[in-house]
Amino acid sequence: VLGGANFPDKYPWEGGTKTWWSTLYSYDLQTGKWTVYDDFLDRPLAYGVSISLPEGLLCIGGCDRTQCSDNVFLIKKEEDSFVIDSVSYPSLPVPLANATGAMGDNCIYIAGGQETMVNEQSTHHFYMLYLMHKERGCQEMPDWNGPSLSYAVGVAQGERFYLFSGRSYAPDEAM
């Protein structure tokens, strides 16, 4: 478990303040124990996309209290600790949080989300990263029919990507 945001002291409707985290929690299946890595990230980060890969956990985008991120990085285990590989994967073309993503046939798909924490708007962004040719970067894919989306669900099956549900909150868009 990495980063995230919550209301640790009070519920939001009771006046609670959202707290953003940079902590990594790791559960060891052999020992049955949790290890906590405080300040694992260089800044708090939440609402990104995570994709499990054989070499580690790929983290894509996300946001903190004030801005969205275009960073893409891999968390991998080296000996008895975890490290961040922030150079092996290309950044997103735009900052994105609250997007969805999935992997199929060596391709990672990222769809929807929002670019900013101010004047929040859902988007039609749709990108594909071919893992065999990361040097090409994230390729822009055609928009889907229908409204822009954030908080959607994405699933890949073979070479196909399916986009379900979500929220549309673009001010100039009719539902």
Segments (PLM) and residue ranges:
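Kelch-like beta-propeller repeat domains
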Residues: 1-175
